[in-house]
Amino acid sequence: NILNVLIMIWFVNLYVKIVTRVIKLKHSDDEEFQLKFISSGMLSTSELSLLQAKKEIALYGQRTQRMFGMVKDLIHEKEGSETFSKIYSRIEKYEKISDRMELEIAAYLNQVADGRLSYDGKLQVSAMLTMTTEIESIGDSCFHLARTVIRKQEAKVEFNEGIEKDIDLMFKLVSEALDNMNLILDKNDMAESDLNKSYNKEMEINN
């Protein structure tokens, strides 16, 4: 046992380097524009193409939620610090990725719609286009929030404790709404309970 511990200690630095490199590569890959499911073009049937588009939209939703988390981090980071600048740069990059993903997914769906598609299939395309537009709108809102934080910094505005608590509460509620959105996007069939949960969360946010 002592020998095993000594060996582990000897290799600790190597483990750290490997893990750090893997995390860094994963982090870097995620922040480059790339479509995971529809990059290879149309599949043999429209139904399969729609399935791939659905997966891509689900991934789009996850990326947008990650962007929202960055905005929360930005608000709690010391303004003007190096970390603050890095987070803002990441948000800016994600916003550009979000815009490109919307365009690419929409172009793919329109291509699917031009093919042989059933009535139900056309309804699915219409719904997916709406989803894509709404997710892109969330990305835009995240970027606008980040810009507001920058303007707050430039104007040297300070929030009191009450305002900060209200902001944290709003972030919590919206984060829960995004959690539910992504759960729905991952499902093949949406239940009425999912819709009710989303509706109730929206009411909670608005109130």
Language-model features: where?
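Cytosolic, long alpha-helical scaffolding segments
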Residues: I2-N207
